[in-house]
Curated annotation (Swiss-Prot):
The chain crosses the membrane at residues 1-21, 35-55, 71-91, 105-125. It is found in: Cell inner membrane. This is Fluoride-specific ion channel FluC. It comes from Chlorobium phaeobacteroides (strain DSM 266 / SMG 266 / 2430). GO terms for cellular component: plasma membrane. One of its GO terms (molecular function) is fluoride channel activity.
Amino acid sequence: MLMKQVSAFLLVGIGGFLGSAARYGASLLLSPVAGGLPLATFSVNIIGCFFIGFISELALSTTLVSPESRLFLVTGFCGGFTTFSSYIFENASLLKDGQMLYTSAYLAGSVIGGFVALYSGTFFAKIWT
């Protein structure tokens, strides 16, 4: 059992490393052409959403994606590449389950909470320095 958990952590970690490296590569590639627009972030978020949807559907409806491959690709790679794709997938899952109130709260709470947390962090960093 312990070896299976260690293997899962390694799959997620290696996938996360590769996803993070791919995100960094996208920022190097797209930043010079964006002219101030956060094109790299926008692009990886949209690509990540497509990829997590594609892989998750294959994992659910076929035998093409093993549970280990799903851990590596979805949790690891997509997690390192973009957390936005996980956020959208979780909201879609809530919607699919008919949880409109939870979906609305999660969407609004994440966006509003994210802005509040960002500005709070900025505020406290300015006080601290």
